[in-house]
Amino acid sequence: MLLLSCNLEEDDLKSLLETGASVNAPPDPQEQSPAHLAAGGGLACFLLWQLQTGADLNQQDVLGETPLHKAAKVGSLDCLSLLVASDVQIGVCNKNGQTAEDLAWSYGFPECARFLTMIKCMQTARSSGEQQERDPRAPVLRQKRSFRTVESGVMKRKC
């Protein structure tokens, strides 16, 4: 049933865009693109269609918010996942200096906030790993570090 309703909404919105408006054109005074509206409404199916038609998922509205901010404000983990999988920039701040992660926490969506925190950590680790690969000392940096715990005397890897 959800797919049916998404398809109907998608068809309606698709016909609006087929009238000649750009997929990234802000349709309202708030400068929200169709991707902003889809993410803010938690409509992952329409957001996916926006992706397939070339929407700029990093476009900011008058508040400086991207579709990622909108999805975080409504707690749409589906939209957040789709946006992150599309390599959206997660560190963008709105005009109040808030990231999507900050908004998820402040709007009471801890699951979404933890998801964005995890993605941010993974991206940081990935970029750190890429820097190490370019570093001539990389083999030394990749060696495991261990320490002996006082209680057990067992060697453990230290993260």
From Swiss-Prot:
Pfam families: Ank_2. Expressed testis, ovary, uterus, kidney, liver, but not in other tissues. It is found in: Nucleus; Cytoplasm. InterPro entries: Ank_Repeat/CDKN_Inhibitor (IPR050776), Ankyrin_rpt (IPR002110), Ankyrin_rpt-contain_sf (IPR036770). Ubiquitinated by the CRL2(FEM1B) complex, leading to its degradation. This is Ankyrin repeat domain-containing protein 37. The keyword Ribosomal protein does not apply. PANTHER family: ANK_REP_REGION DOMAIN-CONTAINING PROTEIN (PTHR24201), ANKYRIN REPEAT DOMAIN-CONTAINING PROTEIN 37 (PTHR24201:SF0). Keywords: ANK repeat, Cytoplasm, Nucleus, Repeat, Ubl conjugation. ANK repeats lie at residues 1-25, 30-59, 63-92. The lineage of its organism: Eukaryota, Metazoa, Chordata, Craniata, Vertebrata. Its main location: nucleus. One of its GO terms (cellular component) is male germ cell nucleus. Gene3D superfamilies: Ankyrin repeat-containing domain. The keyword Transmembrane does not apply. It comes from the Eukaryota. PROSITE patterns: ANK_REP_REGION, ANK_REPEAT. A motif (Nuclear localization signal) lies at residues 130-150.
